[in-house]
Structure formats: C-alpha cells, structure tokens
C-alpha cells in the first residue's frame, strides 16, 4: 500500500536478526521510547513480542518532500562563514523545529553556512554523533526526516548552506 510503513529485519541462519544497514529509518527498542512526541510525532510502533533488536522501516510510495527552494547555490568555499552546532546542545528542545525557529538569529550573526555535527543514527540518544550507525538514517532524537528537510529548506530560503558532518570511519557497536 502506497505510503504505508513496514518494518523488517534480515534473518540469518535462523536466529540472527539484523536491520538493513542502508535503512533510512529504524526502530530502536532501547532508545525510541525516550523521544518525545513533540520531536517525533506518531512514530511507527515497535513490534514488541514479535522480534528483538533494531528494525528497518520502509515506506514505499511515500510522498516526496515539496522543496520550496529548488535553485539554492552554496557560497564559494573561500567565502564560507560557518557556524558549527549540535542540535542537542544548541537549542533546549533539541529538535529541528526549534532550530528552524532560531535561523533568523543565526542569520543576524553574519554566517552563510551551518555545519551540523553528525545528525545520523548513533547508539543511544545522548551523543555528539561521532559513534554512527545506520549511515543513511537520521537520528529520530532530533526529529523526523521531513522536519530535517524543512530545516534545510528554511536555511536555503535565508541563503544559508547546510554542511553535514559524516564520520564513516567511527562506526562501531550496533553498526
């Protein structure tokens, strides 16, 4: 069914369950219950009693994000004035919506780029993001993938480039 979310895992040798390492969204039974509804409303429920471990979520036929800014051009590298931030520490509510609400303040500082410390999935909920797992998934602790796209779109509308810190060589643990 188009737009419906489905959870799945790979079952290996009849007893090892793994989420898809290329998953754009996961369910984590140990950490998702600590994410508030204001940050990640209507989360897909974890299939308690049916499996264990991290579950991949896919949504075939999902509506693509409708970008307001489709022609953004980033500043030349030599002209970048970058503000690096960690969503969790920069705004008290630690979510993309509150970050969007502070973009005018950041713009007044004279910057033209925001560098996000790694926003991808990482183990637990409290981290700088330098312990990544599931490199294609954004960590739900900061908000939904749609809200992240809205953040990028809002930055571009103000002339701000968005740089995402990625640390593939730091992967460990559940990765």
Language-model features and meaning:
Residues 81-85, 114-116, 162-164:
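Hydrophobic faces of well-ordered beta-strands that scaffold small-molecule active sites
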Residues 2-80:
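The feature marks proteins involved in alpha-glucan
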Residues 86-91, 120, 139, 168:
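Short, flexible loop/turn elements at secondary-structure junctions
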